[in-house]
């Protein structure tokens, strides 16, 4: 009898992808291999967010090799938030996570997230770069940008969480499905809208340590955050705040 599996867990992992054709097949198969070590029943939902390369074809290739993987593809590009919302809407698991498809955040982290969710009776567990146990290997500029955004969010939303933007989060299905159905953010402000709405609804949000290895080779595709993205995140965040104020949230 196996003792290292979450016997009663059904986990859905949503992995948004944009121009990730170079490595998405291997990353999906690797994620499935890791999940199989601690989850008995799981699915991986890979969402091709209107890619201009062969991401959709590569996701289909992974589907053909592993029945735990299923793909969703659409045009045009809708933004990371749109991709995650699409994946969550299709998810069937009792627990639903989303994970960046570049695997800079290793999928084994979800084992700790599931454990923390049960032990702390949390509704949401989020990865935090500011957790004292986190191990970070990424550029100083990204560290500065991340901390600056944290300070802005703290002033605007008064959240008790320290890091809203890390690309790995775990939710109870009954918590995230109603929230996502009401959301409007399409881009990078998607995370803050989820957490702000959850906090207003009195949901328990816990933070867990992460290991982040920034190894992106920009010649291999994907999306790099630039100055235009920073401005867009700021504008989207202000819009989230405005909507929540307008609707009394």
Which role does the model predict for each range below?
Residues 10-12, 43, 193:
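Cell-envelope/extracellular polymer assembly enzymes that use nucleotide-activated donors
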Residues 20-23, 51, 80, 106:
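Donor nucleotide-sugar binding loop of glycosyltransferases
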Residues 48-57, 103:
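A conserved acidic beta->alpha catalytic loop
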Residues 68-90, 95, 107-188, 214-234, ...:
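Acceptor/aglycone-binding surface of glycosyltransferases and processive sugar-polymer synthases
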